[in-house]
Structures are given as C-alpha cells and as structure tokens.
UniProtKB/Swiss-Prot annotation:
Domain BTB: 56-123
GO cellular component, as recorded: actin cytoskeleton; Cul3-RING ubiquitin ligase complex; cytoplasm; cytosol; lamellipodium; ruffle; stress fiber
Main location: cytoplasm
Biased composition (Basic and acidic residues): 17-29
Pfam families for this protein: BACK (PF07707), BTB (PF00651), Kelch_1 (PF01344)
Molecular-function annotations in GO: actin binding; protein homodimerization activity; ubiquitin-like ligase-substrate adaptor activity
Residue stretches of each Kelch repeat: 308-353, 354-400, 402-447, 449-496, 497-543, 545-591
UniProt-recorded name of the protein: Kelch-like protein 2
Residue ranges of coiled coil: none
Described purpose of this protein according to its UniProt entry: Substrate-specific adapter of a BCR (BTB-CUL3-RBX1) E3 ubiquitin ligase complex that mediates the ubiquitination of target proteins, such as NPTXR, WNK1, WNK3 and WNK4, leading most often to their proteasomal degradation. The BCR(KLHL2) complex catalyzes ubiquitination and degradation of NPTXR. Responsible for degradative ubiquitination of the WNK kinases WNK1, WNK3 and WNK4. Plays a role in the reorganization of the actin cytoskeleton. Promotes growth of cell projections in oligodendrocyte precursors.
C-alpha cells in the first residue's frame, strides 16, 4: 500500500497555495535556515580539488612557479582576477596566465589565501606581500599587512614604515607612522633612518607643532646631527632648517653656550639672524613677548602619549630581577619581563625606545654589564659592556649618548665618566669629574649634565658639591653647592629645574628637597617629602615629580609620592609597588601601542 504524500510544506491541509503573510501570524512562517559551515566546507573541498589539480581551468604563472586554480574562485575573491576573467582580455580565455609583477612564492601565498582565508604575515614577507595584495586587490590581506606594520612601529623603523606606507597608498598606516614619529621624536632622531632622510622630509618633520619634546634643544641638536652626517652636501641647508627651529623657546644659557658657539650657525648669516631674533625675544618684558608672534615663538602642542613608570631590579633586601610598571592612567602596577640576572644600584635611562640598565651590583660583584629592554617585545637584550665596573653610578642621556657617571667599583669611588654610542654599540671615556662620587645623582638641563652630591671615599664624606659637564668643551665645572650634604639623593628634572630629593648624611636620612635653577646658579628649599628616603628613584611626568621606593634607614619602601610645583605639596600615591625596593632603577617610557 502506498503512503500518501505529505502536504506541501508551509501550506494548510488540503490547500496548495502558500500562506498569505498578511493573513497569517508571522510566527507561523517557516524559518530560513543558514548553515554557517557551508561556505567553509565548500572552499575546503575546492582547495582539495585544486591540490589534486582537478577541475582546474587556469594555471597562474609567476617566475618559475605554476599554480593551478579555478577561474570562478579567483574571480569571486579578487577584483583583479574578476576583471581579467570576465572581460574581453585575452587572459579570459587563456589556459596559462603569467603575472609579472609578483614573485612566485608570494603569489602562491595569496592564491592559498583565496582558498583558505589563512595567511601569515612576518617581518620577512610583509614588504612583498603588501604590494602584491594591493595589485590583486585583496584588501583584507593589505589591511592585515598594515596592522602588522603598525604593531612593529619603533623609533628605529617608523620613518621607513612611513615612506613604505606612502609609496603603497596606505593612508591610515601613513598617518599612524607619522604620528608615531612626532610622538617619539627624541628617539627617532637617533636612528639611521632620520640621518638618511631628504631635506624636504626633515623640514616637514621638524616644522610639526605636534612634536613631543622635553625642550626645543632636541630639535636643534637633531638638525646639527643631520647636517653633520653629510656636512659637505648638507651645510647649505642650515638656514632652511633653522627656520623651523624655535630658538626663542630655548633657555638663554643654551643659546649663548651652545647655539652661538656652533660652527654651522656661525658660518650662516641667516642662522645668526635667527639667533639674534631669539636673544631679542629674551630681552623683552613678558607682556611684549606676547606681542612678538611668529612660527618660532609658538609653543608646540604635542598629543600626550600615555606613560608608564618602569622600576627595574633593586635591593629587596638582596639584589633582585623583578621589573614592574606603573600605569599612570589606570593607576595600577603590573609585572613585565624580568632582568636576565639580578641587579641593584644600577644606572637607568630611556633612550631610542629602549630602557637601559647600566652596571650595578648582582649580589656578589660590581658589574660592567648593560642590558636593554624593549617595551614592545617585552624582552631584555645584552649590549656592549662598560669599560669599568660601576655600582651606585648615575646615568643620563645627553645629545644622543648614554653617560655613566662615577660610582663604586668594589674598592674605590670613581671620578671617571664614560659614554655609550648606541649606533656603534661602543663605550668610550670622556673627561673625569673633579671629585670621586659614588651614590651620585645626575640630571640634564639646558644641554649640560649635572652630577649632584654623592659620597667621596677618599675623604669619607657625603658631598654637598655639584659639578656640570659641557660635552662640547669636554670639561667638568663646579657650580653652586647644595645647602646640605646628600649621598644617595634622588635627582630629577622638571620644568628646566634640577631637583635633589632626600638622600643621607651619614646616619641621617633626609626628607628635605632642594631645587637648582641654572639661570640664577642657586639652590632653594621646597616642601619636604612625607617620609625620609635615600637611594630612591626619581622621574618627572605630566608636570609632577615622582619619588619611588628607597629606604628610610631601617627598611625598604614600596610607597611612591609625587611633588606638584604649583602647590608646593607632596602627595602619596595610593597604589604601592609589590615589594619594597631601594637602589632600583626608575624611568618613564611611552606606553607600547
């Protein structure tokens, strides 16, 4: 007996017409079924057919690479192939199609992507993959390449990435690379890419209002470095470059001691005119300065990058490897990659997008080793050793060089000073200080390097003396003394003023703070910290001076406090480090993208 047929789907019993949506409840309609795996399964089968060379109707050829494929698949995924196979071009009927603009391996990767939606972008292939994806109009691949390059932005490569993005019409990447270069200007100008820029590109960069710089001297020194890189050819551009350096914004001392003495300025009448303009600006009363409006008197208005404070190693109570960061925006601490080995009493700087931990004590020996930390990769790497072993040294960056100042080598305090050139990965000695100084604090203001206080092992005294180093003359000169002896003082620079924070004189641990103004060659007292600290880290960020950890003479401190010069008050940060640390290295970095 035959089974009677079922009534047609979605019809009333005994009726053959579909339901009228106007008459019936929509909820009774049959749902539309969508199988999310259907397309994926179909492409998987098509890729299997391709790998077996089944049903393929075209062979794509690049160099000596032959790639069987299906026209309909290529045309469906690539507008380039769609135009080729659906138009009147000879390739629409050809069994073999040669692509001359792309190498074989890259084309194979892109055809694989068409079938699988999978691709791996690396440092090695991105420069050929992106233009090839652009040619085949595979916009998703091009976007992936741009996102990869954006994640790789670094002071040493951002100018090259910017040029690459410009060449291949990657507008978003171009803008981001340009912004990155502006925000990291002080480190970018130390790169080979900057030194190899053309004059138009240099002028475009240094004329930007968005440069993130601590002082206009960064721009002046960048110009001098660029010209000296190929002096015979480039010195004719000095006047054109100096037009974009905002000399009136520089301190008078820097104008007289550095700019006026620069041979490249002396040899250009136009440059001397810019210098005279700047000097006149400084001679005017404040009210009249406001009326002297020009591009060179306009303050730059950079976009503020989010900052992190990095605290490296330290004594807790023995030398440790731990590294932690404080996020100012999120107001919290987090751990990052540890040091390769234990280290305390080290010098610490941020230069060329890297954090450098210089010398120090590993728990048994004073060391001359140096490690650099890449915040983007969260990775430490060893660089060239110093010439001398140093702990309790001072470290600072001046004119693109890292200086290691004084310290203790295990037997005696040091007056020697050495500098590190990141480009050659080499250390070399410069003029020694006039006094041996261990537990010395250092800072850079107005193109001069200051060594503050410390301990003189020869006289067995904590020091109140201060001396400054002029790199052009390669000499150290005493300046005004502090009001008190300070060894292990934290030293920081804020608003072109030099701060000496805490420290000790023998058993007495201080909470007092004094500040030095280079324009008056005088120290003055400001508000005391909330607690006594010596061997603490100091850094300036967002107009505030932060003091981190240290010890109070009896225990290591995990607390942090900051000084506001506007209110002359210290405030304790609510969030503490995970452990108390003294002799830790502290610096501020740009938060990685």
């Amino acid at each position: 007996m035959e089974t009677p047929p079922l009534p047609p789907a979605c019809t009333k019993q005994g009726h053959q017409k579909p339901l009228d949506s106007k008459d019936e409840n929509p909820e009774k309609h049959c749902p539309l079924t969508v199988n999310p795996w259907h397309m994926k399964k179909a492409f998987k089968v098509m890729n299997e057919l391709r790998s077996q060379n089944l049903l393929c109707d075209v062979t794509i050829v690049a160099e000596d690479m032959e790639i069987p494929a299906h026209r309909v698949v290529l045309a469906a995924c690539s507008p380039y192939f769609h135009a080729m196979f659906t138009g009147e071009m000879s390739e629409s009927r050809a069994k073999r199609v040669r692509i001359k603009e792309v190498d074989g391996w890259t084309l194979r990767m892109l055809v694989d992507y068409v079938y699988t939606a999978e691709i791996q972008v690396t440092e090695e292939n991105v420069q050929v993959l992106l233009p090839a994806a652009g040619l085949l109009q595979l916009q998703d691949v091009k976007k992936t390449c741009c996102e990869f390059l954006e994640s790789q932005l670094h002071p040493v490569n951002c100018l090259g990435i910017r040029a690459f993005a410009d060449m291949h019409a990657c507008t978003d990447l171009l803008n981001k690379a340009n912004t990155y270069a502006e925000q990291h200007f002080a480190d970018v100008v130390l790169s080979e890419e900057f030194l190899n820029l053309g004059i138009e590109q240099v002028c475009s960069l240094i004329s930007s209002d968005k440069l993130t710089i601590s002082s206009e001297e960064k721009v002046f020194e960048a110009v001098i470095a660029w010209v000296n890189h190929d002096k015979d050819v480039r010195q004719e551009f000095m006047a054109r470059l100096m037009e974009h350096v905002r000399l009136p914004l520089l301190p008078r001392e820097y104008l007289v001691q550095r700019v006026e003495e620069e041979a490249l300025v002396k040899n250009s009448s136009a440059c001397k005119d810019y210098l005279i303009e700047a000097m006149k600006y400084h001679l005017l009363p404040t009210e009249q300065r406001m009326l002297m409006k020009s591009v060179r008197t306009r303050l730059r208005t950079p976009m503020n990058l989010p900052k992190l404070m990095v605290v490296v190693g330290g004594q807790a109570p023995k030398a440790i490897r731990s590294v932690e960061c404080y996020d100012f925006k999120e107001e919290r601490w987090h751990q990052v990659a540890e040091l390769p080995s234990r280290r305390c009493r080290a010098g610490m700087v941020y230069m060329a997008g890297l954090v450098f931990a210089v010398g120090g004590f590993n728990g048994s020996l004073r060391v001359r080793t140096v490690d650099s930390y890449d915040p983007v990769k969260d990775q430490w790497t060893s660089v060239a050793n110093m010439r001398d072993r140093r702990s309790t040294l001072g470290a600072a960056v001046l004119n693109g060089l890292l200086y290691a100042v004084g310290g203790f080598d295990g037997s005696t305090g040091l007056s020697s000073v050495e500098a590190y050139n990141i480009k050659s990965n080499e250390w070399f000695h410069v003029a020694p200080m006039n006094t041996r100084r261990s537990s010395v604090g250092v800072g850079v203001v107005g193109g001069l390097l200051y060594a503050v206080g410390g301990y003189d092992g020869a006289s067995r005294q904590c020091l109140s003396t201060v001396e400054c180093y002029n790199a052009t003359a390669n000499e150290w000169t005493y300046i005004a003394e502090m009001s008190t002896r300070r060894s292990g003082a934290g030293v920081g620079v804020l608003n072109n003023l030099l701060y000496a924070v805490g420290g000790h004189d023998g058993p007495l641990v201080r909470k007092s703070v004094e500040v030095y103004d280079p324009t008056t060659n005088a120290w003055r007292q400001v508000a005391d910290m909330n607690m006594c600290r010596r061997n603490a880290g100091v850094c300036a960020v967002n107009g505030l001076l932060y003091v981190v950890g240290g010890d109070d003479g009896s225990c290591n401190l995990a607390s942090v406090e900051y000084y506001n010069p506007t209110t002359d008050k210290w405030t304790v940060v609510s969030s503490c480090m995970s452990t108390g640390r003294s002799y830790a290295g502290v610096t501020v970095i740009d938060k990685p993208l």
